[in-house]
C-alpha cells in the first residue's frame, strides 16, 4: 500500500468517531436523511436476502439512473441474484425509491471510513461490486479487495483535471485501479488516462447512453395540457443555480412569451427560483404545492422528482441546463443528458459546457442538438423554432436518430460481468 493511502486510512480511522456528529449537522442542513443516518455509518436498514447478491454503487441522480438498464438485464439473465443499490445523495435516494423495481434494495452508501465500510461489507457480503463512473473511495475499494470481492468500474470516467491530480500520486492511483477486476471506460479519453495511471481497459461502456424514453403519467399529461391550452411550451430542463434567471430574462424579449416550465436539477432550490421569477415580474405556479397553471401563469416551477418525462413531452422546445456556466459567470456544470429529450424527438438547445457528454458534439454535427455560445442567441433560436414547426420537427427527428444510433455498450458490460458472477444457486 502506498504511503498516501496508508495515511488516508489511518486518518479516517482516527476521525471516524466524529462521523455521527458531522452527519447530524448535514442532516440539519438538509443534506442527509436524518431517519437513515445509520446507513451512512454502515449499519443496515434492512435484512440481507439469502443467496448471492450484486452490489451496485453510484453517487448522484444521473449515475444512479444509469444503473436501471443493468438491473433490468440482471433480472432477465440472472433472476436468482439479489441486487443492492447504494447512492450518496438525498435526491438520488428519492429518485431510486420511485424508479427501482420491486425487490431491489436501496441503501445509502457508507462514509469512507474503515469501521463503516467494514460493517457495511460484513452485513451485505456482496458477490460482486459494480461501481459507476469515478467512485474511487479508498477504504471501500481496498477493503472489498482484501475480502476477495470482485469489483467492476463501469462507465469509468476520469477528467483531465482528475488525472492531473492522480499523476501526482501515482502509487495510490495504481493501487486503487489495480483493485478492480474489470474497468470499462466510457470513452477513449478516459481510457487513455486510466491506462496511463496503471489501470486496465476492458472495453467501452457508457451507461448513460443506454435507455428507453423517460416514463410519464398520461393522466397528468392530459391534465396539464388542458391547463396550458394552446400556448407554446418551452421547458428549461435540469437547470443549475443562476441559469433560471439568466435564461428566462433572455426569453422575456419574446412576444408573446411562451409558457415556461422550469425543472431545476435540484428541487430544493425551489424557493430561490420562485423569488427570482417574481423579481422578473412573472406569475409562478409551483408543482410541489399542487398549484395548477392558470390563464395568467407564465412560469410553472416543477420542483418534484421523477417527472422529467412528463415535462419533456409537453415541450415544443427544450433548453437543457447545466451547460451555461461559462456564459453567466458560474462554475462549469458539464451539461446534462441530451439523449433524454432526443429520445422524445424534442428540438433541444443547450450551452457550451457539455464536457460530461462526449456524444453532444456528434449530436450537434448531425443537427440533433444546437449548442449556443452566446446567450443573445437564445431568444431568436427559440422564436425561430416556435414560428416554424416543420423546422422544429426536423431538428427533433435528427435528435431522435442520433439517440437511436447511440450504443452504450450494455452487451459489452454483460460479457465482462458474467464471468465474475457466482454460478446460479451460488453465494
Language-model-derived ranges and their functions:
Residues 1-427:
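Nucleotide-activated sugar donor-binding and catalytic core shared by glycosyltransferases
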Amino acid at each position: 500500500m502506498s504511503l498516501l493511502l496508508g495515511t488516508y486510512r489511518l486518518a479516517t480511522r482516527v476521525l471516524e468517531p466524529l462521523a455521527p456528529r458531522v452527519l447530524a449537522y448535514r442532516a440539519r442542513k438538509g443534506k442527509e436523511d436524518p431517519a437513515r443516518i445509520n446507513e451512512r455509518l454502515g449499519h443496515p436498514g434492512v435484512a440481507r436476502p439469502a443467496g448471492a447478491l450484486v452490489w451496485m454503487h453510484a453517487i448522484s441522480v444521473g449515475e444512479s439512473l444509469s444503473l436501471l438498464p443493468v438491473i433490468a438485464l440482471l433480472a432477465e439473465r440472472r433472476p436468482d441474484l439479489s441486487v443492492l443499490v447504494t447512492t450518496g445523495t438525498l435526491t438520488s435516494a428519492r429518485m431510486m425509491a420511485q424508479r427501482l423495481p420491486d425487490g431491489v434494495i436501496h441503501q445509502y452508501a457508507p462514509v469512507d471510513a474503515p469501521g463503516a465500510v467494514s460493517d457495511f461489507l460484513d452485513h451485505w457480503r456482496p458477490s460482486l461490486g459494480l461501481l459507476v463512473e469515478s467512485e474511487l473511495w479508498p477504504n471501500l475499494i481496498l477493503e472489498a479487495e482484501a475480502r476477495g470481492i470482485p469489483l467492476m468500474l463501469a462507465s469509468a470516467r476520469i477528467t483531465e483535471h482528475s488525472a492531473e491530480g492522480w499523476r501526482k500520486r501515482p502509487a495510490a492511483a495504481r493501487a486503487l485501479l489495480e483493485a478492480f477486476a474489470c474497468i470499462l471506460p466510457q470513452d477513449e479519453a478516459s481510457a487513455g488516462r486510466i491506462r496511463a495511471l496503471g489501470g486496465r481497459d476492458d472495453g467501452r461502456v457508457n451507461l448513460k447512453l443506454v435507455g428507453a424514453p423517460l416514463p410519464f403519467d398520461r393522466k397528468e399529461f392530459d391534465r396539464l395540457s388542458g391547463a396550458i391550452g394552446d400556448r407554446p411550451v418551452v421547458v428549461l430542463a435540469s437547470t443549475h443555480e443562476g441559469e433560471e434567471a439568466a435564461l428566462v430574462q433572455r426569453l422575456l424579449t419574446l412576444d408573446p412569451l411562451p409558457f415556461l416550465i422550469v425543472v431545476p436539477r435540484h428541487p430544493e432550490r425551489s424557493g430561490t427560483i420562485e423569488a427570482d421569477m417574481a423579481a422578473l415580474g412573472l406569475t409562478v405556479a409551483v408543482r410541489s404545492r399542487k398549484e395548477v397553471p392558470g390563464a395568467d401563469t407564465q412560469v410553472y416551477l416543477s420542483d418534484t422528482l421523477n417527472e422529467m418525462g412528463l415535462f419533456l413531452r409537453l415541450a415544443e422546445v427544450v433548453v437543457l441546463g447545466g451547460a451555461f456556466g461559462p456564459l453567466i459567470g458560474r462554475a462549469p456544470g458539464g451539461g446534462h443528458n441530451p439523449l433524454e429529450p432526443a429520445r422524445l424527438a424534442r428540438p433541444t438547445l443547450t450551452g457550451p459546457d457539455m464536457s460530461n457528454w462526449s456524444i453532444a458534439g456528434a449530436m450537434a454535427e448531425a443537427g440533433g442538438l444546437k449548442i449556443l455560445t452566446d446567450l443573445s442567441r437564445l431568444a431568436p433560436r427559440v422564436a425561430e423554432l416556435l414560428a416554424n414547426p416543420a423546422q422544429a420537427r426536423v431538428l427533433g427527428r435528427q435528435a431522435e436518430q442520433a439517440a437511436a444510433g447511440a450504443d452504450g455498450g450494455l452487451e459489452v458490460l454483460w460479457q465482462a460481468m458474467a464471468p465474475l458472477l457466482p454460478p446460479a444457486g451460488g453465494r
